[in-house]
Amino acid sequence: MSLQDAHNSSSPSQKLPLWVQCLEHGQGLGLPHYATEGSAGLDLRAALPENESITLSPGQRALIPTGLIFHLSPGFEAQIRPRSGLALKNGITCLNTPGTIDSDYRGEVKVLLINLGQEDFIIERGMRIAQTVIAPVTQVEVRLLDPNSDLTSSQTDLSNQPNTGRGTGGFGSTGQK
């Protein structure tokens, strides 16, 4: 199947449902939504009390409530990601990116923000603070390879794997250019 065929076979009407429970402090903020037709992430808003704000000083972090509980389908996760505009203009980003909301989590979705900028940043009720991307999850069965045992054809013989150019190099071993 070509990329064009795959694109043509999907339509906006075939979107998966995301069931969301709105908590009392999230009332009036609206549901997460895509900013444009091609957006990958749904915008999340700060569910702070009316007339209250949080000031993030440079280097400070805070856990911001969204007022939402996601009921994800099994086999999916919600990834919490920063908004590029907040990062570029103010140095505001998510500390653990992407944050993962597992399908069996039933608590409020919260966003851990940090101010990496040079000035205080004020977060107010209803402000778009992050985005969430719903993604499929692949779980694996972890198996311990015993290097002293005879590997059968149903097992992977890692001893015959060729060396790679990367080898055991990590954390910057491939360079920056």
Swiss-Prot record:
InterPro entries reported for this sequence: dUTPase (IPR008181), dUTPase-like (IPR029054), dUTPase-like_sf (IPR036157), dUTPase_trimeric (IPR033704)
GO biological process terms held by the UniProt record: dUMP biosynthetic process; dUTP catabolic process
Region named Disordered: 150-177
Co-factor(s): Mg(2+)
Bias (Gly residues): 166-177
Catalyzed reaction equations: dUTP + H2O = dUMP + diphosphate + H(+)
Entry-linked SUPFAM superfamilies: dUTPase-like
Top EC class for this record: hydrolase
Name of the molecule in the record: Deoxyuridine 5'-triphosphate nucleotidohydrolase
Pathway: Pyrimidine metabolism; dUMP biosynthesis; dUMP from dCTP (dUTP route): step 2/2
UniProt biased composition (Polar residues): 150-163
Record: residues binding substrate: 83-85, 96, 100-102, 110
Family the UniProt entry places it in: Belongs to the dUTPase family.
GO molecular function: dUTP diphosphatase activity; magnesium ion binding
EC nos: 3.6.1.23
Record keywords, A-Z: Hydrolase, Magnesium, Metal-binding, Nucleotide metabolism
Function of the molecule: This enzyme is involved in nucleotide metabolism: it produces dUMP, the immediate precursor of thymidine nucleotides and it decreases the intracellular concentration of dUTP so that uracil cannot be incorporated into DNA.
